Structures are given as C-alpha cells and as structure tokens.
C-alpha cells in the first residue's frame, strides 16, 4: 500500500510541477486567402470567422513550443475583381488545421508587461473546395477535374490534405502572472496552387465533356452564365501556376497558465511576481 501511495504522490508532484509551464491558448479572428480568385496580398474582403484552441509549453520566459487546432472557412468570387469578373468562378472551403510551432518573445514577459513575438513551425491542413451551380446545388470541385486532372497531359489530382509552413508574429500583454492577451497575424505558405481549384489553362471542352461530363464543363468556366459572357479558348489561362496559394489568420489570442506560477519551474529561471515594466 505504501509503495502505491508514494507512486501516486510522485505522479501528482510531477504533473503539478510541469503543468505550471503549460498554457491553454484560445484564439478567435478571421481567415482569408490569396490566390487566383483573390489577388490582394492582404485584405479583410471575403474573410470568414475562425477559431483555434491549443496548448503551449514554456521552455523559458522567452521561448515556447505550441500546438493548435484551427477551424475556419475560406472563399472567393471573381465578381469582386473587375479583372477576372468575366471568368465568373468562385469557391468555398472549410479549413481544418493542426500546427506545431516555436514562439519566441523579444522581451522577457516575467519582467515586461508587453512583448512582441515571432513564431514559425509546421502544419497539416484539410480543405475541400466547392461551388454551387445556377440552381443552388453544391458540387465539390476536386472530383470534377475542372482542368483535366487525372486524364490530361501530366496534370494530377490534387490532395485535399497537405502540409504548410505557418509563420508570423504578434504582440502580447500580461494581465498578471497567469493570463496573457494579444493580437496575432499568421501566414500559411502552401505547396499547392489548387486551394481554389484554379491553376493552369482551359483544356478542350470536348475532351472535358467526354471524360468528366456536362457538369464539369459547366463549372470549369462560368463566364457563359453572364449576360455578355464570351466562350473561352483552349489553352487560354484559367489561372496562374507561377505562384502558389496562401491563407492567413488575423485575430485575438488569449493564454492561461495551468496552475499557479508560484512554485513553477519557470520561477527558478526568472523573477517572481507580476511584470513591472512596460
């Protein structure tokens, strides 16, 4: 009985000591994307709400390792851009991301109440672009092969779960010893140009019709739905494969330390008490 009691006591002591270096993180804000249907590098136009929940571990008061799960939505429509309005394409996609990153504070937050920070890491994300036809029926775009993926030349179907490189920064304010709030901007470098299902050129409509049917032909080019819409030419640019797509997050983040800071392992490496400098 005594060994069991000692084991339980040791486990509780270990968990209590290490939990005080952990922070629960919660972020809320907006996601947007930059690509063939949204050429602006950064804008709130067509943005959507997003939320992220995670856990951060403090190696010291300036360097943290964090992991998050983010849920969001991305969309864009040619009608908002005069240069591409005649193409009339659009997409919407849900977004699920899991990331791990290192977060570095430029100032010791045990001493300073405010500090800018930078982060970079790795992420896996899942997307699935879709559109609605003129009757309002929803169609997922990847199975349609709108640019001939899977049967035309060397164009291969794109994967719906891929890797990205998240990086960015922000500013955090310490509200006492255990709570921090801040503003964060994070960019995701993607390795696909098909987040929006648009990348290369139009293929022969007869070939598209023969291999994927009338619905793919209808949704591959939607300029014909417009009053003065013109037909496309085979080989004409549908998008630009020169640049990959991006998406980004802007929002407010909050972190709460698990356990009281007094007695934590960080305590032995830094000053005690609330930050005293701005």
Question: What residue spans do the PLM features occupy?
Answer:
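Outer-membrane beta-barrel proteins
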Residues: 33-39, 75-80, 126-132, 191-196, ...
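Gram-negative (and chloroplast) outer-membrane scaffold detector with strong preference
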Residues: 63-144
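Residues that define the transmembrane beta-barrel architecture of outer-membrane proteins
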Residues: 45-49, 94-98, 114, 159-165, ...
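Short loop/turn motifs that connect adjacent beta-strands in outer-membrane beta-barrel proteins
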Residues: 19-21, 62, 108-115, 132, ...
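Outer-membrane beta-barrel transmembrane domain signature
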Residues: 121-245
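Residues on the lipid-exposed face of transmembrane beta-strands in outer-membrane beta-barrel proteins
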Residues: 26, 53-57, 100-104, 120-122, ...
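Extracellular loop and loop/strand-boundary signature of outer-membrane beta-barrel proteins
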Residues: 34-42, 83-91, 151-157, 237-240
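Short glycine/proline- and aromatic-enriched beta-strand/turn motifs that initiate or cap beta-hairpins
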Residues: 20-58, 247-251, 255-261, 278
């Amino acid at each position: 009985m005594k060994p069991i009691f000692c084991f339980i006591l040791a486990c509780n002591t270990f968990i209590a000591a290490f939990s005080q270096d952990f922070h629960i993180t919660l972020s809320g804000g907006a996601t947007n994307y930059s690509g063939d249907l949204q050429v602006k590098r950064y804008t709130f136009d067509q943005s959507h709400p997003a939320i992220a929940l995670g856990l951060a571990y403090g190696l010291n008061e300036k360097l943290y390792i964090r992991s998050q799960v983010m849920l969001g939505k991305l969309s864009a429509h040619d009608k908002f851009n005069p240069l591409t309005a005649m193409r009339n394409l659009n997409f919407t996609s849900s977004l699920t991301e899991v990331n791990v990153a290192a977060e570095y504070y430029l100032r010791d937050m045990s001493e300073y109440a405010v500090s800018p920070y930078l982060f970079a890491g790795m992420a896996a994300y899942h997307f699935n672009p879709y559109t609605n036809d003129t009757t309002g029926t929803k169609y997922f775009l990847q199975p349609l092969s709108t640019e001939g993926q899977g049967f035309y030349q060397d164009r291969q179907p794109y994967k719906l779960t891929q890797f990205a490189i998240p990086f960015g920064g922000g500013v955090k304010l310490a509200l006492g010893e255990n709570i921090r709030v801040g503003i964060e901007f994070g960019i995701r470098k993607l390795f696909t140009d098909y987040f929006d299902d648009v990348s290369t050129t139009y293929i022969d409509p007869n070939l598209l019709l023969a291999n994927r049917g009338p619905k793919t032909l209808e949704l591959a080019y939607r300029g014909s739905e417009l009053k003065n819409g013109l037909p496309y030419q085979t080989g004409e640019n549908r998008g630009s494969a020169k640049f990959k797509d991006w998406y980004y997050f802007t929002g407010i983040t909050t972190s709460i330390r698990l356990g009281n800071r007094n007695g934590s392992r960080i305590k032995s490496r830094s000053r005690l008490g609330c930050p005293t400098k701005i």
